[in-house]
Amino acid sequence: MGQKTHPIGFRLGVIKDWPSKWYPPKKDYAKLLHEDLKIKNYIKKRYKVAGVSKVEIERIVDKVRIKIHTAKPAIVIGRRGQEVDRLKKTIERMLPGKEISISVLEVKVPELDAQLVAEDIALQIERRVSHRRAMKRAIDNALKAGQKGVKVQVKGRIGGAARARKEWFLVGRMPLQTLRADIDYGFATAYTKYGILSVKVWIYKGDVLKGGKEEILKKIEEEIKQAAKEG
């Protein structure tokens, strides 16, 4: 039976970075891991309507830096920064004795963020929109923005069927085993009266090389063609 690897975890340390950065003693590892999960789940739940894509946490001695990537930063920041100040005080109570700093970063194109796309499809399914329509719309939006490939999968008791099944659409390329391939991945859950449906989204954005993005490859190809013409 084939085993699936997580597209982001598979590329950590190669072209992807860790969402949590800290180096604790072995005895503190589990404690800090649970603290991170608690903070991330709390922020995602508190700002569900803000479209929070991911939360990054960095710890340096007694300082904790939190980066919130969201499609609607105004909701997280609040009027004159009041909301983000309230969030900071709440997290300070969760982590007593720590110096907390929070930065809010905008996701400029939510249609290209796999996590936000997955959550949007799940929300549409909960509102009884056809799953196929939601999936195809998400794929069309990503391809119009110039992405190389998109895959969307929905699994569960689709449409209230007696048996669970999965449906998926793939348009373009999706090189899952190529480490230099920049693949964004998102997962969401849709709660319906028939049960739970899982939604997974993969977006292939092109290849990443040590020197930069895939434009380097294009430049090399152009130089080779030019040299061939001159030769």
Curated annotation (Swiss-Prot):
Q: Which Pfam families match?
A: KH_2, Ribosomal_S3_C
User: Which Gene3D superfamilies does this entry report, sorted A to Z?
Assistant: 3.30.300.20, Ribosomal protein S3, C-terminal domain
A GO molecular function assigned to this protein is: mRNA binding
Domain called KH type-2: residue spans: 39-108
Species source reads Aquifex pyrophilus
This chain's protein is named Small ribosomal subunit protein uS3
Q: Which domain of life is it from?
A: Bacteria
Question: Mind listing the UniProt keywords for this protein, alphabetically?
Answer: Ribonucleoprotein, Ribosomal protein, RNA-binding, rRNA-binding
InterPro entries tied to this protein? KH_dom, KH_dom-like_a/b, KH_dom_type_2, KH_sf_prok-type, Ribosomal_S3_C_sf, Ribosomal_uS3_bac-typ, Ribosomal_uS3_C, Ribosomal_uS3_CS
